[in-house]
Structure formats: structure tokens, C-alpha cells
């Protein structure tokens, strides 16, 4: 009898252990794996519901471009502080069938009545109707869809129309900016009507509905891009901007065209090619950073010991400083001859000359890097990366310029408009002693210099290896470079490449900003080499990346903005 009881007791213990084990295992087995590797297609962006919209568009037979447009329309709702249909974007597109890359430029342009000295202060270029440029976002979607779309145009709008009507919880990124811009928003009746409850800005998790934008999306879905530029929306858009003191006219909207660039900027990295936009974007800056650094033959060993890691990061920061010194010469190639500048910035010989000027034991005064002009900060961006089942890819970055752009929001259409603060102005001085860049002065029809660099890396076999880009003002270029360096040279998986603590230096001001959780060995090594370091108040930009691995497409959406990838 005693023996029987012992056996029964042991069986009971085993049964309990099995049940506990199943309880622990089953929930995790039903979840998506933490590494986010997808066998067929992937999307990385900074809003979960938008990722799911992009993924479902791919599942429904949509192309990479279809998924990008559908997801961007959603991001324009959920992260309205960063982008929307009243702004502009660039798309880098790779077609796996033709094995060709192209860029679509749909950045906003200065109105025909604009002139170089139209702003006497930064406030004028940042806020109000006068600061609004001619939006290009919808024309960009149209051109991309005409060239690469598979699903009907209207289908791409439907998920976001539903989302705008039903509402959604305010996410981490939008909530942080609403709190940061609380005073401005609560004092603007139209903005506060959208983003406030009981005259107080919405907090994370509270519900935001956008019924006016839903109506506008419906009109665009039915009428196409024409509705915005010379159709049923056009007159109201002009009226809203001019009522706020702006100079955008019907003629400006009628004449706006997105631009196809069939031969984008590219450089070699080992046995791969990196495709990105040239000037007026910061592709040449990214190219110069990587060309300088590839001469060091970085590898996993470059960051193995504190000494090696410190030297490696010093070299990276010095490459940033040289590249940003040359950035000040860039501008819109339709108005400024930047051929020689871009040729130098993408030349391995030129990069080697700059590399030879990097001292491993110290940094140098600003004048050592020979900056010629100063260009203003930019900000308020959103990026997404997409890879479709056929191996085609899109890297897209859209921007409203500064958070909430011009702060001009239509009480009728719900459209929030950009500002022109990315231009330089002869009337606005800076504290760094460098004159404003004439290459970036305002002219009618001109586009300003920007830090965006949506990038696609392709191997010799014609297959995409990496799709990457970032959002976050002038930090975009350095963060995109770091993600590539971390993955390609240091051997970090894509999740670590996106999440790894980062640093930034744009030469002016003479400060290296580091994220709070960066390795202390890096900070100590920089300070030993006379770098002025400061801890970032929040985070340094937000990266979205997809990388080809043996197991499929590994995707990472930056947790700094609450991102999470999707795929299948």
C-alpha cells in the first residue's frame, strides 16, 4: 500500500511539472519569434498597425510599393507630427525582376512667389502659412504606383480611412511630441481640436480620431492625386494656406510634378552596391562616411576590447565630422551645380585623403575640417522599409520638417502642412560663426537640403541584402551609417544593429552626443581624445531595417519610437 502511494505521488508530481511546462511553453509558441525573421516578406516602420497594413497589402498580392504607400498613409495618421499628405518624401525602389534601382523625388518645393530673404527669423520659417511649401507626397505615391503598383489605387487607402474614422490609441512617439509641444498645440484652436481632450493634449493610450482626414483620404482614393493638385481638394488647400498668411497658389499645385531618378547614387561596399538618393538629400554624406571608414577594414575584432572599441568609435566620429563639413556645399542640383562636390564625396580617392587626416590620438578644432557654410537642423521625419515576396524592396522617408510642420492644420480637410525651415536664409545667422549656405537659399521651385537617405544594399547576385533608413533630423545620416556599420562590419544581427546605443556629431556644434546607455569605454575613449561629449536628452533618431539572412528576412523596428516589425 505504501509503495502504491509513493508511485501515485511521483506520478502526480510529474503531471504537475508537465502542466506547468505546457503553460509556460504554449503562450510563447503561439507568439511571433523575438528575432522577427520572415521567410517571404517583411515590413519595418514605427507604428504597429501601419506595419500590419503593409504586411496585409503584401499578402493580398500587393507589390513592395503598394505596401509602402498603404503603410505610409497609416503612419501619416498615427505619427501625424512627423509626416502626412501635406508634406514630401523620397523613395528608393529596387525592382528584383529588372535588377534596377531608382529614386522617386516627391519633396515639397518653394512656391513661385518665394524669395531668398523672405524670412527674417527662424520663427517665420517654422510656423504659419508663409512657411508652407508646395506638398509633394501624393504625387510621389502616384508616380510610384503608376510604375510599380499591382493593387488598385483606392485599395491602398481603405485601411487608413477605416482607422481614421474609428480612431486609434495615441502611440509612444506621438504622445512624447504632444507633451513636448503642449503649449503650442493647446494655444492653436484647430490643432487642439484634433489633438486635445478637454483643452489638454492627448496622452499615450488615449483615443485619437481623424474624421476630416478620413474624408480627404476617401476623396483621394476615388479621384486620385488629381484631387489634391487640380481637383476637388485643391481650392480648399490654397484657401487654408493663404488664410494662414501663406503664398502657395493654385498654379503652384497645378505645376507640381514628382521626379523619377533612374540612376541613383551608388557606391561599392565589399561585394555589394549601396543605392541611395543624391543631393538634395544626404546620400553623398552617407557615401563619404562609409568610404572613409571602409579603409579601416572594420570587423568584429574592431570592438572586442575597450581599447579597440574606443579607437573605432573615435574614427567613426571623425568620419562624421569630415562628411558634415562637406555637406554644407550641397543643394538642389536644379539650381546649384553640385556635380564636382558629389563626385568628390563619392570618390574613394577623396575619402582616402580625408582618412589620412584623421589622427588616432585626438580630435581637432572645427576649422581643421574646413566647413564653409552652415545648414540648419531638420526633423519631424518617418521612415519605413519593405521587402516583398518577389525580392523587390522600398526604402521610403517622408518629412514634415519640424514636429507638426508649420502648425497650419486645415479645419476642413484635416491636412497638416510642412514648413520651409530646412532652407538656409541670408537673414538668419547662427551661433557657430559659419555663414548660411548660399547653395541652400530659397528660390521658387527649389527643394531644400535634407538629411534623409533611404538606402537599399544589393549583392552581386542581384538580391537585396539590406533595406535601411532612419528618421530624426540631422542624425538620420549618421544613424543610417551606424546601422550599416554595425551589421555589415561588426557582424551584429539586425535587431542589435538597430537597438545598439548610438552617437552623433555633425561638426557644428562641436559636440558628440551619445545615448545614455552607450558603453562607458566609448565615452571615456572619446574624452581622452579631446571630444566634447554630452548625453542625449531622449534618443538619437529612429532606424528601420530589414536584412537578408539564411533563415529569411530579419526585420527590426526601432524600440526608441515603439516600433515592431511585421511580415510572413
Swiss-Prot record:
Cysteine pairings via disulfide bonds: none
Carbohydrate attachment residues: 95, 120, 230, 266, 297, 344, 510
Topology in the lipid bilayer: Single-pass type II membrane protein
Stored PROSITE patterns: G_GLU_TRANSPEPTIDASE
Predominant cellular place of this UniProt entry's protein: membrane
Localization (cell): Membrane
Glycoprotein listed as a keyword: yes
Parts of the chain that traverse the membrane: 5-26
Keywords: Acyltransferase, Glutathione biosynthesis, Glycoprotein, Hydrolase, Membrane, Protease, Signal-anchor, Transferase, Transmembrane, Transmembrane helix, Zymogen
Family the entry assigns: Belongs to the gamma-glutamyltransferase family.
Protein name (Swiss-Prot/TrEMBL): Putative glutathione hydrolase 3 proenzyme
Organism: Homo sapiens (Human)
Organism lineage string: Eukaryota, Metazoa, Chordata, Craniata, Vertebrata
Gene that encodes the chain: GGT3P
Amino acid at each position: 500500500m505504501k509503495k502504491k502511494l509513493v508511485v501515485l505521488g511521483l506520478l502526480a508530481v510529474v503531471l504537475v511539472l508537465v502542466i506547468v511546462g505546457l503553460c509556460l511553453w504554449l503562450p510563447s509558441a503561439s507568439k511571433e519569434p523575438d528575432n522577427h525573421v520572415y521567410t517571404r516578406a517583411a515590413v519595418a516602420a514605427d507604428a504597429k498597425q501601419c506595419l500590419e497594413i503593409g504586411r496585409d497589402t503584401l499578402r493580398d498580392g500587393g507589390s513592395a510599393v503598394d505596401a509602402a504607400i498603404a503603410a505610409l498613409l497609416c503612419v501619416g495618421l498615427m505619427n501625424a507630427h512627423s509626416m502626412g499628405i501635406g508634406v514630401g518624401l523620397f523613395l528608393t525602389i529596387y525592382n528584383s525582376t529588372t535588377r534596377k534601382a531608382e529614386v522617386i523625388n516627391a519633396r515639397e518645393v518653394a512656391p513661385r512667389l518665394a524669395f531668398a530673404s523672405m524670412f527674417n527669423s527662424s520663427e517665420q520659417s517654422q510656423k504659419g502659412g508663409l512657411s508652407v511649401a508646395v506638398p509633394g507626397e501624393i504625387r510621389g505615391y502616384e508616380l510610384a504606383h503608376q510604375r510599380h503598383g499591382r493593387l488598385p489605387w483606392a485599395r491602398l487607402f481603405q485601411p487608413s480611412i477605416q482607422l481614421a474614422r474609428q480612431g486609434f490609441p495615441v502611440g509612444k512617439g506621438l504622445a512624447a511630441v504632444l507633451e513636448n509641444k503642449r503649449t503650442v498645440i493647446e494655444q492653436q484652436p484647430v490643432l487642439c481640436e484634433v489633438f486635445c481632450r478637454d483643452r489638454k493634449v492627448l496622452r499615450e493610450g488615449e483615443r485619437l480620431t481623424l474624421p476630416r482626414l478620413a474624408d480627404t483620404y476617401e476623396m483621394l482614393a476615388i479621384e486620385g492625386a488629381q484631387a489634391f493638385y487640380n481637383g476637388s481638394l485643391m481650392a480648399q488647400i490654397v484657401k487654408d494656406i493663404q488664410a494662414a498668411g501663406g503664398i502657395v497658389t493654385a498654379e503652384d499645385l497645378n505645376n507640381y510634378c514628382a521626379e523619377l531618378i533612374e540612376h541613383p547614387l551608388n557606391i561599392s561596399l565589399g561585394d555589394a552596391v549601396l543605392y541611395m538618393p543624391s543631393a538634395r538629400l544626404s546620400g553623398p554624406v552617407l557615401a563619404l562616411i562609409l568610404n572613409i571608414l571602409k579603409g579601416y577594414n572594420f570587423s568584429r575584432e574592431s570592438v572586442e576590447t575597450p581599447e579597440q572599441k574606443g579607437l573605432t568609435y573615435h574614427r567613426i566620429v571623425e568620419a562624421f565630422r569630415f562628411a558634415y563639413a562637406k555637406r554644407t556645399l550641397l543643394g538642389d542640383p536644379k539650381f546649384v551645380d553640385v556635380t564636382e562636390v558629389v563626385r568628390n564625396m563619392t570618390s574613394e580617392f577623396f575619402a582616402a585623403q580625408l582618412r589620412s587626416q584623421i589622427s588616432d590620438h585626438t580630435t581637432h578644432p572645427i576649422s581643421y575640417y574646413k566647413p564653409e557654410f552652415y545648414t540648419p537642423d531638420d526633423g519631424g521625419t518617418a521612415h519605413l522599409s519593405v521587402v516583398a515576396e518577389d525580392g523587390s524592396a522600398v526604402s521610403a522617408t517622408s518629412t514634415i520638417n519640424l514636429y507638426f510642420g508649420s502648425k497650419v492644420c486645415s479645419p476642413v480637410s484635416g491636412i497638416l502642412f510642412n514648413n520651409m525651415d530646412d532652407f538656409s536664409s541670408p537673414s538668419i545667422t547662427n551661433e557657430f560663426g559659419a555663414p548660411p549656405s548660399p547653395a541652400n537659399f530659397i528660390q521658387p521651385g527649389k527643394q531644400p537640403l535634407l538629411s534623409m537617405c533611404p538606402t537599399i544594399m544589393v549583392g552581386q547576385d542581384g538580391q537585396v541584402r539590406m533595406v535601411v533608413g532612419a528618421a530624426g533630423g540631422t542624425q538620420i545620416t549618421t544613424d543610417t551609417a551606424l546601422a550599416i556599420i554595425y551589421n555589415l562590419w561588426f557582424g551584429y544581427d539586425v535587431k542589435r544593429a538597430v537597438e545598439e546605443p548610438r552617437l552623433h556629431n555633425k561638426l557644428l556644434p562641436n559636440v558628440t552626443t551619445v545615448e545614455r546607455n552607450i558603453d562607458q569605454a566609448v565615452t571615456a575613449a572619446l574624452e581622452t581624445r579631446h571630444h566634447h561629449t554630452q548625453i542625449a536628452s531622449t534618443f538619437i533618431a529612429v532606424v528601420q531595417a530589414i536584412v537578408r539572412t539564411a533563415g529569411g528576412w530579419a526585420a527590426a523596428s526601432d524600440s526608441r519610437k515603439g516600433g515592431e516589425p511585421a511580415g510572413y
